[in-house]
């Protein structure tokens, strides 16, 4: 059906379910799986949305942090989780860093780690 709609209008904004999500390293992936169950469930829901529709979720689910860095905002009664990510050529999303939020502001240390990893990923491209 998607192909048929594309034939009808070249301007149709239909995205296939072919975005892939990967992790900066195994530690990042493991840390996220160790989040409280409710926060992790919200994370998985948002990841499925990104795989289906791309990385442009917007607030309240995602927020641009500048220079190609984005923040995935996972929330539940158990707390708040944040996962920083970037997009790559070829419909790829890379989860760079994650943490459980304990204060109103995003700690500088967490943001610096994400920005450093963003540079590493972009330079390896």
Predicted segments — roles?
Residues 1-80, 89-93, 100-125:
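Basic, Lys/Arg-enriched alpha-helical interface segments
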């Amino acid at each position: 059906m998607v192909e048929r709609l594309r034939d009808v209008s070249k301007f149709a904004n239909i995205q296939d379910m072919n975005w892939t999500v990967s992790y900066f390293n195994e530690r990042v992936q493991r840390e996220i799986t160790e989040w409280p169950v409710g926060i992790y469930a919200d994370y998985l829901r948002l990841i499925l949305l990104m795989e289906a529709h791309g990385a442009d979720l917007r607030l309240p689910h995602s927020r641009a942090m500048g220079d190609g860095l984005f923040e995935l905002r996972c929330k539940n009664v158990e707390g708040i989780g944040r996962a920083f990510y970037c997009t790559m050529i070829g419909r790829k999303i890379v989860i760079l860093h994650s943490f459980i939020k304990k204060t109103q502001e995003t700690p500088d240390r967490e943001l610096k780690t994400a920005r450093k990893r963003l540079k590493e990923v972009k330079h390896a491209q």
